[in-house]
Amino acid sequence: MGWPEEYGGQGKSAIEQFIFYDETMRVGSPAPMLTINTVGPTIMEYGTDEQKDSFLPEIAAGKLHFCIGYSEPDAGTDLASLATKAVRDGDEYVINGQKTWTSLALGCDYIWLAARTNPDVPKHKGISLFAIPIDTPGIT
């Protein structure tokens, strides 16, 4: 509801969107909160045109769902302590690490994964987010 119309939303205010979510939760209706409230707006703000064109229409239509890939066995949700690394290899990144307590993993299409991309800066910096298909080889 609160997404801009150009991205498939209704252009409603934040208050109207919160009321909608409150009512959705009150009646127990499923809603992809992470995808709608975190992933979509982040892509709107920071994504490339290609990412916007690929992800946002599918999210707005309720056809694409993300799980969250932040927590790690030795760090919990302390993102500054991330050990998972993403190293550029040509036009791609190779990601190595371990995630745990992956919220919303059942039935998701992508992992919204945080990984360290720059180990040479303070630990609360040098972290990037990746949209990784859940069926990527190596994900178990």
Segments from the language model and where they lie:
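A short, Trp-centered hydrophobic/proline-enriched beta-strand micro-motif
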Residues: 62-70
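A short core secondary-structure module
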Residues: 92, 96-140
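Short, solvent-exposed loop/turn elements at beta->coil junctions and helix N-caps
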Residues: 6-8, 71-75, 100-101
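A structural signal for short hydrophobic beta-strand segments in well-ordered beta-sheet cores
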Residues: 84-87
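Active-site-adjacent elements of ketosynthase-type condensing enzymes
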Residues: 74-82
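Internal helix-loop-helix
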Residues: 1-62, 104-110
